[in-house]
């Protein structure tokens, strides 16, 4: 919360071995919560691994063009999709920082329907050449429509395959039903090491 403005409790944080695993798990949670598969919008160009994960599990994925402020909300509205996958801190691969105005537009879009969500991939928000980072999109969300995904692979070590997902309360019941089917993909040892690393203040 202190560095990114993310609002959550420990129970809302789901740990997994990489963003791709968490994205597949999230898709199952959304299917459970809404009784069927949802469709996705992705920035164009986009993080290709995430694109191929969603296409590989049979989801409809609509590429949405960018402008100087990030994903075009006008183009997003022209496509009948449920989930917008965005990289607002540093758009991958173009590096665009999504403006506050565009973030609010996205939140408005998501709030217009119960089955709309935003996946915020905050993969490298810790790195900046100048200025303070804009707070995470999740921290601006008042309706529980943003799923925040972060990773320690960029900020600590590439060999540490540990990512995390912050679920809104509205998806926690689905996680309790679906998530318990799977073993955790990150060892308890690695989790405890990172926990101690953060608690001792070395991550700041």
Describe the predicted segments one by one.
Residues 1-114, 126, 132-140:
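Conserved core of the PLP fold type I
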Residues 89, 115, 145, 202-203:
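Generic structural signal for secondary-structure transition and capping sites
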Residues 121-122:
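Walker B catalytic acidic pair
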Residues 125-127, 135-138, 150, 154, ...:
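Flexible, active-site-adjacent loop/turn segments at secondary-structure boundaries
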Residues 129-132, 159-161:
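Short aromatic-enriched loop/helix-cap "lid" or pocket-rim segments at secondary-structure transitions
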Residues 146-204:
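PLP-dependent aminotransferase class I/II
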């Amino acid at each position: 919360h202190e560095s990114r403005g993310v609002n959550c409790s420990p129970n809302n944080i789901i740990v997994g071995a990489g963003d791709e695993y968490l994205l597949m798990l999230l898709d199952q949670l959304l299917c459970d919560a809404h009784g069927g598969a949802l469709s996705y919008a992705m920035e164009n160009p986009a993080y290709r691994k995430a694109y191929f994960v969603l296409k590989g599990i049979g989801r409809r994925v609509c590429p949405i063009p960018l402008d100087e402020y990030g994903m075009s909300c006008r183009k997003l509205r022209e496509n009948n999709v449920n989930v917008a996958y965005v990289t607002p801190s540093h758009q991958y691969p173009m590096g665009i920082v999504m403006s506050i105005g565009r973030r609010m537009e996205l939140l408005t879009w998501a709030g217009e329907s119960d089955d709309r969500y935003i996946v915020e991939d905050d993969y490298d928000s810790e790195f900046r050449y100048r200025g303070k980072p804009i707070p995470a999109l999740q921290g601006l969300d008042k309706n529980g429509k943003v799923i925040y995904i972060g990773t320690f692979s960029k900020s600590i070590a590439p060999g540490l395959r540990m990512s995390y997902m912050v679920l809104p309360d509205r998806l926690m019941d689905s996680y309790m039903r679906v998530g318990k089917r799977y073993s955790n993909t990150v060892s308890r040892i690695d989790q405890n090491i990172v926990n101690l690393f953060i608690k001792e203040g070395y991550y700041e």
